[in-house]
């Protein structure tokens, strides 16, 4: 089950970054006024790590090898049971939308790279490095 990592560096007073983690997923979200504004759902292990990225106004991107959406999303929905309900429902809606639009979603790059704040527990200065902006 995903657990929240606390003390994540906050770089924008108008929004909140949050980080949830388990043994398979890292979920990075940005919320504005409590609403989901962006997320990165990172999954896989080490060299095979991939990410599904969404942000309002930009839409979806997928980093890494092509996504077999149904098993990943099913696994995520089981892991997300402990997330705050409003966030869990918003993420679930976005993931279902992704499944419906999958053919239209471009890949940004073939290998996923984390931003500095996502590698260190969020305590470094992420200026100009965060993909969730």
Language model: regions and residue ranges:
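Intrinsically disordered, low-complexity regions
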Residues: 3, 16-17, 69-73
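Generic preference for hydrophobic/aromatic residues in regular secondary structure cores
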Residues: 1-2, 18-20, 27, 59-61
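Mixed-charge, Lys/Arg-enriched low-complexity segments
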Residues: 55-127, 132
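Short N-terminal edge-element motif at the start of the domain
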Residues: 1-14
């Amino acid at each position: 089950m995903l657990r929240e990592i606390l003390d994540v560096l906050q770089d924008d007073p108008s929004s909140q970054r949050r980080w949830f983690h388990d043994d398979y997923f890292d979920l990075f979200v940005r919320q504005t006024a409590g609403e989901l504004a962006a997320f990165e759902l990172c999954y896989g292990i080490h060299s095979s790590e991939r990410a599904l990225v969404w942000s309002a106004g930009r839409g979806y991107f997928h980093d890494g090898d092509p996504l077999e959406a149904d098993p990943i999303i099913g696994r995520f929905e089981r892991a997300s049971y402990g997330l705050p309900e409003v966030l869990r429902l918003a993420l679930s809606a976005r993931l279902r939308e992704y499944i419906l639009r999958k053919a239209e979603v471009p890949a940004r790059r073939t290998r996923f790279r984390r931003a500095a704040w996502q590698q260190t527990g969020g305590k470094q200065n992420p200026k100009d490095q965060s993909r969730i902006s």
